[in-house]
Amino acid sequence: MELKVLNTSGTETGEVVTLNEEIFGVEVSEHAMYLDVKSILANKRQGTHKAKTRAQVRGGGRKPYRQKGTGNARQGSTRSPLMIGGGTIFGPQPRSYDQKVNKKVKLLARRSALSAKAKAGKILVIEDFRLDAIKTKPVAEILKNLGLEQKKILMLTPEYDMIIARSGRNIPVLNIMTADKVSTYDILNSSAILFQKTALTKIEDTLG
């Protein structure tokens, strides 16, 4: 698949890039993408939820009233799960939600996600650009020139550029990342992917 390279004004530069078929032209595996995205979202969970059992609730050591003769049901503690203010039965405890996915599956998932975007025509390539200062306006104008200002965009750069990253972080629809750090979730969670030209080489080195 070939794509025309655009400039920051949204016009064609006359240059054409060829997408690597091993990355952008594979058969899409929805199951691999599902496994990878599920693990990514699960691994983000802190797992610090905690409810106290009857043994952990403060107090309740003394028997609230005598065993017999009151007419009430027998109770040994005011911290019983049956009492108001008591412990919780089978409540949430701290745990790890981490899920392991094999490297080959993660690789297939990212290739599948990129291939799905390529087949849908949701990949654009722009020439490499730099900004002189941290300003949101130039980045917003680039998106407007490309007709992407109303879409959820993933911009991939060849390397971390602090000025570009900070200039774009105030735009809600824009997510800027380096090509070698992108995940399946990042790809699928965007309406379109905007590659800087040399970022294509970077991602081919990573996923090739």
UniProtKB/Swiss-Prot annotation:
<keyword id="KW-0689">Ribosomal protein</keyword>
<feature type="compositionally biased region" description="Polar residues">
    <location>
        <begin position="69"/>
        <end position="80"/>
    </location>
</feature>
<dbReference type="InterPro" id="IPR002136">
    <property type="entry name" value="Ribosomal_uL4"/>
</dbReference>
<comment type="similarity">
    <text>Belongs to the universal ribosomal protein uL4 family.</text>
</comment>
<dbReference type="GO" id="GO:0005840">
    <property type="term" value="C:ribosome"/>
</dbReference>
<comment type="function">
    <text>One of the primary rRNA binding proteins, this protein initially binds near the 5'-end of the 23S rRNA. It is important during the early stages of 50S assembly. It makes multiple contacts with different domains of the 23S rRNA in the assembled 50S subunit and ribosome.</text>
</comment>
<dbReference type="InterPro" id="IPR013005">
    <property type="entry name" value="Ribosomal_uL4-like"/>
</dbReference>
<protein>
    <recommendedName>
        <fullName>Large ribosomal subunit protein uL4</fullName>
    </recommendedName>
</protein>
<dbReference type="GO" id="GO:0003735">
    <property type="term" value="F:structural constituent of ribosome"/>
</dbReference>
<comment type="function">
    <text>Forms part of the polypeptide exit tunnel.</text>
</comment>
<feature type="compositionally biased region" description="Basic residues">
    <location>
        <begin position="46"/>
        <end position="66"/>
    </location>
</feature>
<dbReference type="Pfam" id="PF00573">
    <property type="entry name" value="Ribosomal_L4"/>
</dbReference>
<feature type="region of interest" description="Disordered">
    <location>
        <begin position="45"/>
        <end position="85"/>
    </location>
</feature>
<comment type="subunit">
    <text>Part of the 50S ribosomal subunit.</text>
</comment>
<keyword id="KW-0699">rRNA-binding</keyword>
<dbReference type="GO" id="GO:1990904">
    <property type="term" value="C:ribonucleoprotein complex"/>
</dbReference>
<dbReference type="GO" id="GO:0019843">
    <property type="term" value="F:rRNA binding"/>
</dbReference>
<keyword id="KW-0694">RNA-binding</keyword>
<dbReference type="InterPro" id="IPR023574">
    <property type="entry name" value="Ribosomal_uL4_dom_sf"/>
</dbReference>
<keyword id="KW-0687">Ribonucleoprotein</keyword>
<dbReference type="GO" id="GO:0006412">
    <property type="term" value="P:translation"/>
</dbReference>
